[in-house]
A protein has these predicted regions:
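A short alpha-helical cap/connector motif
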Residues: 1-83, 87-111, 115-254
Length: 254
């Protein structure tokens, strides 16, 4: 399943009421939205037909998030589904994550693209290949270290994988407050030391099976009822973790 097929499946099973896209390019992913949408890109070149109520913003994501009330055109200013495919460098992707999280609820879903590079060359910070993920894959490790309260799921989509983030907390400031420390630890010169589990997608879930998991119904139900994070995510997290174990290409330890 490719990235666009998986995103289409997410729109189908999760039925977001609002959608944020960072990094529009030619609009192929944006064309999947059928809901109120904000799309951000400093140099978009949309060629796909669009089918959503859209605010298209020509700006960098940093400049967009620096605006007062950047999500004011969305229902209650809350992002249900976010697709982050901006500049392919770790620090930019990390900032996009914690800036987006401030406009979410725990039932929101964030999707990061290009999280499973296929080679060390493809993961280089200094691009020298045609296909390029950069070092954004390291965001998963940073979240595991600094935000274990989040549940991150690697998805084996073609060509370069994706990461889903569940359990967002709009009040959490750990990532922004620790940004300089995280940057110093994770931003290193090429060649990048890409873990073998990333290159082999050892613990990534099968996208078709994961979209068919039962927890999506419970997640959308909790979202629509506006259940609080405390009890809601604590109850739902084991269901998502069980889906990860059953859908992983290779069994996930623990």
């Amino acid at each position: 399943m490719n990235r666009y097929e998986f995103l289409k499946g997410l729109h189908r099973v999760y039925r977001p009421r609002t959608y944020l896209e960072i990094g529009v390019n030619d609009g192929r992913s944006l064309a999947l939205s059928r809901t109120r949408t904000i799309a951000v890109d400093p140099a978009f070149k949309v060629t796909a037909a669009l089918h959503c109520d859209l605010e298209l913003v020509k700006a960098t994501s940093d400049d967009f998030f620096a605006r007062p009330r950047p999500m004011r055109s969305l229902r209650r200013g809350v992002v249900d589904l976010a697709f982050i495919d901006g500049l392919h460098l770790f620090e930019y992707a990390l900032r996009d994550v914690f800036h987006t999280e401030r406009h979410t609820r725990w039932t929101s879903v964030m999707v990061l693209d290009d999280m499973l590079p296929r080679s060390v060359d493809e993961a280089a910070r200094d691009r020298h290949t045609d296909a390029w993920t950069g070092d954004v894959y390291k965001v998963a490790a940073a979240l595991a270290e600094y935000r274990p309260d989040l549940l991150c799921v690697a998805v084996d989509t073609t060509p370069t994988g994706q990461l889903l983030i569940f359990g967002a907390d709009s009040r959490n400031r750990v990532l922004s407050h620790s940004y300089d420390e995280i940057y110093a630890k994770y931003v290193v010169p090429d060649p990048q030391q890409v873990p073998q589990d990333i290159l082999t997608r050892r613990h990534a879930v099968d996208p078709v099976a994961f979209l068919a998991a039962d927890f999506w119904h419970e997640l959308t139900h909790a979202r629509d009822r506006i259940l609080r994070r405390g009890g809601g995510f604590e109850q739902l997290r084991p269901q998502i973790e069980a889906a990860v174990r059953s859908c992983a290409r290779v069994p996930v330890p623990g």
